[in-house]
Amino acid sequence: MTSSIECQNFLRSLQLLNLLIKIGVQNLILCPGSRSAPLAIAAGELNKLGMVNIFNSIDERSAGFHSLGISAASGNLSLVITTSGTAVSNLLPAAVEADRSCKGVIFLTADRPLRLKDCGANQTVNQEDFLSSVCRSVLSTNLNGLHETQENEILNLVRITEKQISTFPGPIHLNIPIDKPLDISFLNKKNVLEVFKRIYLKKQYVFQKVEIKSDKNKFLEISKIFNLDESGIILVGPYQGSVNDLSSFNKSLEQLQEITGWPVFADPVSGVYSDLRGLVVNWELVLRKHKNLIKCKQLLRLGPMSSSIDLENFLIKFEGIQILIKEKNYRKLDPIKKSFEYDFGLLNFTSILLEELSFNEKNKKSLTPLALDLIEEGKQIKDILKDEIIIDNKITEYKLANLVPKLWPAEHPIMLSASSPIRDWLTFSENGTLTRNCFSFRGASGIDGTLSLALGISRIKNPLLLVTGDLAFVHDINGWLIENSVDMNLTILLIDNNGGNIFNRIYKKNLKEDEFKKLFLMPKEINWSKLSESYQVKFKSVSNFKKLREAFDWSISIQKSVIIKVDIDPENEIYEKNALLEKIIGS
């Protein structure tokens, strides 16, 4: 009986992982543990066969975010394997972000069998409930143990997973009860592998392709209020679709712009291509300067709202029609509750629209007068920024946002951490992110997992530049414990402002300095050079933009993980930036 259970545990683990690979899993993050041993051993064998990449991580929290970074950069499913108990609870932060940013991640967790539940057995908790509030589905094999699970049950579980991910991308929790014995002898492993290779490895499985059918009535309802002959603006927020669909998204956007002639406001992580006609540079500053003068009757919003108070205020006060198009995101996505929401994506919307119009070259429109005016306003602000932001000046966060896209090679990807960087880049980067893939995890917009996310992205797209503040970086310092993380082609631009600089903009004026530091800034005296050395990561500190350019060239050439630190004086930052903004608004 012992031999039977251990063989069945191993065989079913092989079958489950093999099927998950067939629906798109290419990369697997493995966390330590005993209860998950059959899954780990099976993963190791499939790795030997060249079927899946395995990277280990001793911290489940980092593993979850690392897997999410891989999914975002590749457009493919990624997988995390953990043991039971508190290990599962550590996956929640990454599951929350995967849910809100609509990225496919599978959390495969080992559990105790039913006979050990609710009786005080060690390391036995209600882990099947831990991720349920944010996962598309929580599925399980036979509750008595994986060894009692039938082949068709595993196939059905994977089919449900594939259907859920295809319909509404996001996290899936597969909770797998496994009974002892967890190990398997060399002889039994050899015999089971022979059976698996002979019967299951090359077996063909049918996974029903999910076709997402649009609601033509919903389109017609929206098209009645969508007037191509009236002036409007296209607002493109953070891109939530798959990176594999980015080309078709941009083609649809190009077609939409051609038949409207409307101006386009693009978020730094919108995925919009830099050569799109109608792009308005410095659009947030244009909004701030002319908030009451921009007149049009309709707005076409793509994806979630950008992190801009100026944009939010503009949308709240806007009295015309707002249409919001979402990419496979079926939840409400409009916090100001003023838009007509369309769930089926820009490609679908544009295809039906062009079909209704019988589109041809004659339908193309010149840029509208509003577009020409906004583009000119953006260029005037660009001239001011060019005069004011001089490369030899002292480094500040807003200057980094403006100059780093020019210093980092235009074809190389960038990741922006949450908090200050994404906001500064939205205001000052002048569409500099649109020449490349630019990532920022704006689903839940937390600073969690910053380093692990970047390491995940850099496995797929590199050399990658991560722009992060000191607190966001050190919050996820365990990311360096992910396998071969120091060998990734990742450059970290560490903005050291000795605490949460974003709070200087919000709470400082109403608190005493010591209160402000303790309650919000939370500064940490960290020796960054020694910290880097302890993880065997190369480190440089630079004090001006000339040295920063040289440091970028150095970091790309060595093809390893590198930290480049710049020090920021928050007081000087606030004073300089406010003076610059006053000059722009008053021009």
Curated annotation (Swiss-Prot):
Matching entries from Pfam families are given as:
TPP_enzyme_C, TPP_enzyme_N
Supply the enzyme class, top level.
transferase
Q: Which residues form the signal peptide?
A: none
Q: Name one GO biological process term.
A: phylloquinone biosynthetic process
Q: So which cofactors does this thing need?
A: Mg(2+); Mn(2+); thiamine diphosphate
Q: Which SUPFAM superfamilies match?
A: Thiamin diphosphate-binding fold (THDP-binding) (SSF52518)
Q: Which CDD domains match?
A: TPP_PYR_MenD, TPP_SHCHC_synthase
Job description of the protein: Catalyzes the thiamine diphosphate-dependent decarboxylation of 2-oxoglutarate and the subsequent addition of the resulting succinic semialdehyde-thiamine pyrophosphate anion to isochorismate to yield 2-succinyl-5-enolpyruvyl-6-hydroxy-3-cyclohexene-1-carboxylate (SEPHCHC).
The protein, known as: 2-succinyl-5-enolpyruvyl-6-hydroxy-3-cyclohexene-1-carboxylate synthase
Q: What is the lineage of its organism?
A: Bacteria, Bacillati, Cyanobacteriota, Cyanophyceae, Synechococcales
